[in-house]
């Protein structure tokens, strides 16, 4: 990664994170990651969930609708698991910031990775629900009642896959995550913006008005520009604020 590209990405992502060096991993050449280890786990974990779903659908179940139905039929359990990992995420952050205990970048990365990977499953559920409502995919998503054992096998395999990624990324290819991280961050915000525009499209899809049907695309473009403006603005404003607060209050 070229120095100019790195500096540009480090700047635009500075609005997302404090970027404190001791709370961040380092990549090849000693380059600090664009966000802290906890946020690194969050963004990569979100992307990882969609990769795991794709790989399992392609090579194990060989039917994308099988996993889609498992997710749709067991969303309450998935939300419970997400809240469990979110509590670990929050407890680790709160107790370390309040100096009740010391934590490590490995723990920060772990809590972010597992929390966000299950957040990805919830996002997948919302995408499936919207697509089903928009395109009436009742044949593909039939909400068939799968046995709990099928879902348990899937969720265990999913968590095992996340764990394997966690261990291998730490001990084998951690420095190379620096290259994956920008993709994961952009993917995260792309999914959020797309979900918002899909919801808008769902609201106007029944209206026979060509101009209104263009509204979701206009909103998508506007949100992208708004996000970039937000990132650049925070990048300029943040330099002398977050670090000062950290040095005076937390350190």
Provide a role label for each language-model segment.
Residues 2-32, 37-251:
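Secretory/periplasmic and organellar redox-cofactor proteins
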